[in-house]
Amino acid sequence: MNTAETAHWINRLLPGQPEFHQVGAFKVAGYTIDDESIACSVDFGRVNTGLVTEAGAETVDVRSEILSLARADVSVPGRAVGAAATMLLDASLSFKSATDSSVTPMHAQPGQILPCVGIMANLPQEGFSVVHGILADPRIWGPEIPYVREEAGQVNVEAPDEAGDLARLTLPLQLILLTEEEFAIALNEGSDVMFERMAEQEVDLLDLKR
């Protein structure tokens, strides 16, 4: 999908009327609902982080748009989304240009940890306690995650993206911002343990000053 098509799709998924902002190299749609806000990229799908999935005998290219929720001004999750997208783009470019195997890919997929993404978004400087991030399946639509599938040969792209020979799936991916303590648990004990403890403690993920 191109940017206009993606923006139309995202707008059908999220409530209210969006305000679009350019955050670094990425366009982000912002939605405000009472005291909560949602920000979602609409052109991160052009970034190929190397993620594919096997659908039977078929290999499918997987792309995503990054969303983040907060109980704060919409510019706050908007900057976080832009920082996450930039980090993943930079990692993708570094991996593609690497001349040895020491550089590991950073896929846009659930469980991917994004160290210091909050710092990139200037969040601690504004009094927020979240410093890092992790990508996760979004649950705001319940157990089913919306997606768009484009068949091979019918993938609509914008430069510098290339359609390639594969079918493509585009899905939303949630950026959850983490405190230093939560980040340490994810690193040392795994993201599943971290999320279990957060659920047990009824952590409010929208409270970025927790």
Language-model segments: which ranges?
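Short, conserved beta-strand/beta-arch hydrophobic-aromatic motifs that form part
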Residues: 49
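Extended, charge-biased low-complexity segments
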Residues: 67-68
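Acidic, proline/glycine-rich low-complexity IDRs
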Residues: 1-46, 55-62, 71, 75-210
